Amino acid sequence: AMDPQQRLLLTYAWKAIEDAGYASKSLSGTKTGVFIGTGNTGYGSLLANADAEIEGSSAANTSPSVGPNRVSYTLNLHGPSEPIDTACSSSLVAIHHAVSSIEEGTCDMALAGGINTIVLPDVYISFDKAGALSKEGRCKTFSDQADGFAHGEGAGLFFLKKPKAAEADGGHIYGVIKGSAVNHGGRAASLTTPNPKQQAEVIKAAYKKAGIDPKTVSYIEAHGTGT
């Protein structure tokens, strides 16, 4: 049986392409990349616990790395096909990689985003024992009332290409990514604790690349726990 995450990924890839105004068949053979924030869902363990028969396709059907590759295979896309797992920031890092690949010419277009499904309680139990989950089941990002985060499921993909190319095609354009940046906090208070100084640095780097004065920004969204 195929991991539900892979099935959903195929569905949302198709939706993203159509929403952008393209026919999936028109992308066949093109330098279109696939960059997906993904991770282990535990579906393989679920099958093992149910004593499901191991088939020749079992390894591929339950591997997170196969998700984006299955999209590339199904749609015959010839650009890079990469799974990205950086925990809470996986989707944003996937989009960063997609943008960089388009800018350097590795691909002309890209499907980028992330997906997360939870089929076993193991992760919840671990996070709860670590004191990371909100008792109210709500994220209170940037609030002094924050008491943890809510671990959830979801999927979201963008279809990306250079602005001039998108305008020439007459596709549905939601917005323009002016710039992006990525780094790591290095040594912090603990393995999972953010490093505020390095977070500030990566934000500055993104502003600089985009050529945007921070004073002109009036709306900000933050990923995951807001870290």
Q: Predicted segment positions?
A:
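Condensing-enzyme catalytic core of the thiolase-fold
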Residues: 1-227
